[in-house]
Design a protein with these regions (language model features):
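Hydrophobic transmembrane alpha-helices of multi-pass small-molecule transporters
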Residues: 1-20, 24-25, 147-249
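Alpha-helical transmembrane segments and their membrane-interface exit regions
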Residues: 3-6, 26-37, 86-88, 138-148, ...
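Alpha-helical transmembrane segments
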Residues: 18-32, 63-67, 129-142, 189-205, ...
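Helix-loop-helix module between adjacent transmembrane segments
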Residues: 64-73, 101-109, 282-283, 316-322
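Membrane-interfacial helix-loop connectors
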Residues: 80-93, 117-129, 267-323, 335-337
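Membrane-core helix-loop-helix motifs of multi-pass transport proteins
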Residues: 89-173, 331-362
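Juxtamembrane boundary at the C-terminal end of a transmembrane helix
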Residues: 361-372
Length: 372
């Protein structure tokens, strides 16, 4: 990022220090706001002591649970479920795939994900309803493919089958309420950004629930999180701050090189090529946020359709994370549970091409229905 800004300055283009310092402020605000939800969504004592269910139903409960739970509170959902599914201190292949794939599939549609906020930074005016309608079928496909890969039909699904997490509907009450509030507000006031709405509602809803459940003790817990626990997400926040610096550098570099662009327009074919490049970069070890920042900044002069661009970038994240060995999710799984990061690449080798093909089809379908 610094090198790009220097290249721009040497070519007579002033460095965009404002973009470098504040480019991802709204995204960082969202990550901090969503972190408060952990105070009201952690499993209760009954769930922690409940026997683990088995079989095909347990598999789907776990898949849907990590997907819907993770759609709101992000990566802590994976660790909450994984810690409970440990067997003799180890997390099996099937459980690891269910948790990581089910979580990553949220990125196709969830407005609470950093991926969506990062994409919306480069696509103001995107229509959330269309993005969600495009992403939900892809998320459903991802869950179905995962179930096929992990549900061994030759086993007795009531006995030796998948050992899952005892997920209950009450666990999803707060995330579901937040989804309803955000979507309802966006429908009433579409000019208000999704990131702003989530950043406002997440801590407010958390505070209301804490006061209702615990009274003054809940207020102390809320204040304690604000004063002492927000720093727990510092590595992720630094990553997005660095991405803002990178965006400023790319802007300066483009100005220095005469603004050379990869395409002359941004339609479904260009969107598909962008998606393939993001996933290829992730496979080589580039974090999706860097790829999204690069392409979002690079394509901005084309004034691409914001909805198509946001769908493309979120798909790139949803597929790029399971494709890449160095994603934060896979590195965390290795550090906490001893699963080699390259094992995920091997396990997902057939899964990724199927999702890519479906996503490219979805991009073309969205563009065709909207006359792009």
């Amino acid at each position: 990022g610094v090198a790009g800004m220097l290249a721009g300055v040497l070519s007579g283009v002033p460095a965009d220090l404002r973009l470098a310092a504040t480019g991802n402020q709204t995204l960082i605000g969202l990550l901090c706001a969503v972190s408060f939800l952990r105070l009201v969504t952690m499993p209760d004592a009954q769930t922690r002591s409940e026997a683990l269910p088995r079989g095909r139903t347990a598999l789907w409960r776990t898949l849907l649970g990590v997907h819907l739970f993770g759609a709101v509170i992000n990566i802590p959902a994976v660790f909450i479920l994984a810690d409970r599914l440990l067997r003799n201190g180890r997390l099996g292949r099937r459980a690891a795939l269910v948790l990581t794939r089910g979580f990553c599939a949220c990125t196709f549609w969830s407005p609470f994900f950093a991926a969506m906020a990062a994409a919306l930074n480069f696509a103001p005016g995107a229509r959330l309803g269309i993005i969600i309608l495009t992403g939900l079928p892809l998320a459903a496909l991802a869950l179905w493919l995962t179930a096929l890969d992990t549900d061994d039909g030759r086993r007795d699904t009531r006995g030796a089958g998948f050992v899952g997490y005892p997920m209950h509907l009450r666990t999803l009450a707060v995330p579901g309420t937040l989804v309803g509030l955000v979507l309802g507000t966006h429908l009433l006031w579409p000019q208000t950004g999704i990131t702003t709405i989530v950043t406002l509602y997440a801590p407010l809803l958390c505070l209301v629930v804490l006061l209702g459940r615990r009274g003054r003790a809940g207020l102390h817990a809320f204040a304690g999180h604000a004063l002492r626990r927000l720093g727990d997400g510092a590595p992720e926040l630094v990553l997005f701050l660095a991405a803002g610096l990178l965006a400023a550098g790319i802007t300066g570099l483009l100005a220095a090189t005469g603004g050379q662009l990869p395409f002359v327009r941004f339609g479904p074919i260009e969107a598909s090529l962008t998606l393939l490049l993001i996933v290829a970069a992730a496979f080589a070890g580039v974090h999706p946020v860097i790829a999204i920042t690069t392409f979002g900044t690079w394509l901005a002069p084309l004034a691409p359709d914001p909805t198509l661009l946001t769908s493309t970038l979120t798909m790139g994240w949803a597929i790029g994370v399971p494709a890449g060995p160095l994603s934060g999710l896979h590195l965390s799984m290795q550090g906490r549970y001893g699963i080699p990061v390259f094992a995920f690449q091997r396990w997902n080798s057939r899964y990724i091409p199927k999702l890519l093909a479906a996503s490219i089809l979805a991009l073309h379908l969205q563009a065709a229905l909207r006359g792009l």
